[in-house]
Swiss-Prot record:
One of its GO terms (molecular function) is damaged DNA binding. It comes from Salmonella typhimurium. GO terms for biological process: error-prone translesion synthesis; SOS response. Keywords: DNA damage, DNA repair, Plasmid, SOS mutagenesis, SOS response. Involved in UV protection and mutation. This is Protein ImpB. Residues 2-189 form the UmuC domain. One of its GO terms (cellular component) is cytosol. CDD domains: PolY_Pol_V_umuC. Belongs to the DNA polymerase type-Y family. Signal peptide: none annotated.
Amino acid sequence: MFALADINSFYASCEKVFRPDLRNEPVIVLSNNDGCVIARSPEAKALGIRMGQPWFQVRQMRLEKKIHVFSSNYALYHSMSQRVMAVLESLSPAVEPYSIDEMFIDLRGINHCISPEFFGHQLREQVKSWTGLTMGVGIAPTKTLAKSAQWATKQWPQFSGVVALTAENRNRILKLLGLQPVGEVWGVGHRLTEKLNALGINTALQLAQANTAFIRKNFSVILERTVRELNGESCISLEEAPPAKQQIVCSRSFGERITDKDAMHQAVVQYAERAAEKLRGERQYCRQVTTFVRTSPFAVKEPCYSNAAVEKLPLPTQDSRDIIAAACRALNHVWREGYRYMKAGVMLADFTPSGIAQPGLFDEIQPRKNSEKLMKTLDELNQSGKGKVWFAGRGTAPEWQMKREMLSQCYTTKWRDIPLARLG
């Protein structure tokens, strides 16, 4: 048996946890550079605010409907996600983080001691008690059915946030699959939905009843696996350890357009520095660094430009100095004057778990001495707060930094932002 825990309106809910005054109030969270709506509380949804709706369209409504608006506070959201994970791991045999607000839980053996539905309510109540966040729990014999059950928690409020699909309630499974649009099935995207609809497959139940040989021949083994999972045959196991990454990308849209190469250099240094930190967190070494830049594709009155350059490294490295230097060399290849750049990024690839490589006899570049010790010290200094120690090339207060004009406090990651309670 599997359970899927999904935090309701996660970003908006995190903003409410430390603000009791926002209870039952409409809350929305904006994307990078405060561009569009990416999270809505139930109260905000009731006002008709759409996902992806541009901020400028909501700005006037904010005053009329007293909507509380926040910029994305990723440090807070990551911290709260880790708290939820810790609670679930304390109560469950194994947990797989699927996304920042979704976790698969292994329920093997639990049904011999307690009913899955009752255990789901226990999980829900404990997470609410220890983190202040409300979640829905879908329980089923396969991960795909657990996803469908979790979808049902939002459609069937009478189940109080927990829907269990077990062999004992076969009719519930059939009813749910008959109601669920095929496009809502886990792994079925928009294009696949159109193809299935053309064949008369409009619901999850119709997909479950499809011939597996036909699905495999005309679509893929992956969709065949989905059909089997909808019929209760477990084909996708729990992954407690995430698979090793094949690449790391650090990229942001700028708060202000960049026209100066020095400013772009600062941005690339910062992105390369962050990418190197992530690389060390993965315990990997890279042999390829790519820098890319681009203007806005929507600025019709401005010339468009987009380009990328790749730098191959002679030795595998996780040293920020090597990665920053390579990223800046690549920038020199792609930089063109006369453009208003809106985005840049650095991508690391060609990973290896070891930095050991045999240099050529006449190679001028040799491995840096004490590189691992220096990088470990750097990471430890920055562990309690990003940006305590950084490379000078990224500048001190760049104007191009991402706009977050309505950022909430980092209640769980900064000492100065810890909430205070006054008695009396």
